């Protein structure tokens, strides 16, 4: 039996995608729309406080295309806290007009494919920064779930640890070419959602998503073993722009 990779696990993550029922939203009197927006912004203020205390992070993006209209990405120390946030959002007036489109539950993950020393990795500042990240405030976001293939000779889970480590090392070298252009957060979801990992990319240049993903397709680990779900791409929604976004 092949050796399982050990993981370092950080904050839990929820990608909550919604579509907006614009037709119903337009029927609300203006005062009620403004009250709903104010209530939502008060909720986000709570998220901002949590982020300032480095007890979690969040991002809000509007999604381009018809798969969804808006994304709430939330990071918290526990699954219970994610559930509380999701429930609190669902109880707002605005949520009456936010229809579920897609969701993904996972946990920020680093694997042990790259060898490390004897030091406790959870005490290394750079490791902690990656496990408990404050999400970038970039202009664009790209999210997609993925699996490792388990078919015939292309069965990732039948490879030895050494083979997997070498393939991931080469894959990581491709990613490092985009340092400073794209920030990547990998979240593990085996046993938590339908795919095995979620990949979230942040950049101020959306074209870098295409370039990075395309170049990585030529890495053996992706060409032989990568299987992908739907891609979601969006633009950042600053809180000062929420009122204008929902204005009708």
UniProtKB/Swiss-Prot annotation:
Involved in coproporphyrin-dependent heme b biosynthesis. Catalyzes the decarboxylation of Fe-coproporphyrin III (coproheme) to heme b (protoheme IX), the last step of the pathway. The reaction occurs in a stepwise manner with a three-propionate harderoheme intermediate. It comes from Geobacillus stearothermophilus (strain DSM 13240 / CIP 106956 / 10). The gene is chdC. The keyword Oxidoreductase applies. It catalyses: Fe-coproporphyrin III + 2 H2O2 + 2 H(+) = heme b + 2 CO2 + 4 H2O; Fe-coproporphyrin III + H2O2 + H(+) = harderoheme III + CO2 + 2 H2O; harderoheme III + H2O2 + H(+) = heme b + CO2 + 2 H2O. The active site is at 144. Pathway: Porphyrin-containing compound metabolism; protoheme biosynthesis. Coiled coil: none annotated. SUPFAM superfamilies: Dimeric alpha+beta barrel. GO terms for biological process: heme B biosynthetic process. Homopentamer. Belongs to the ChdC family. Type 1 subfamily. Its EC number is 1.3.98.5. Fe-coproporphyrin III acts both as a substrate and a redox cofactor. Its cofactor is Fe-coproporphyrin III. Fe-coproporphyrin III binds at residues 130, 144-148, 171, 184, 222. Keywords: Heme, Heme biosynthesis, Iron, Metal-binding, Oxidoreductase. The keyword Disulfide bond does not apply. GO terms for molecular function: heme binding; metal ion binding; oxidoreductase activity, acting on the CH-CH group of donors, oxygen as acceptor; peroxidase activity. This is Coproheme decarboxylase. The lineage of its organism: Bacteria, Bacillati, Bacillota, Bacilli, Bacillales. InterPro entries: CHDC (IPR031332), ChdC/CLD (IPR010644), Dimeric_a/b-barrel (IPR011008).
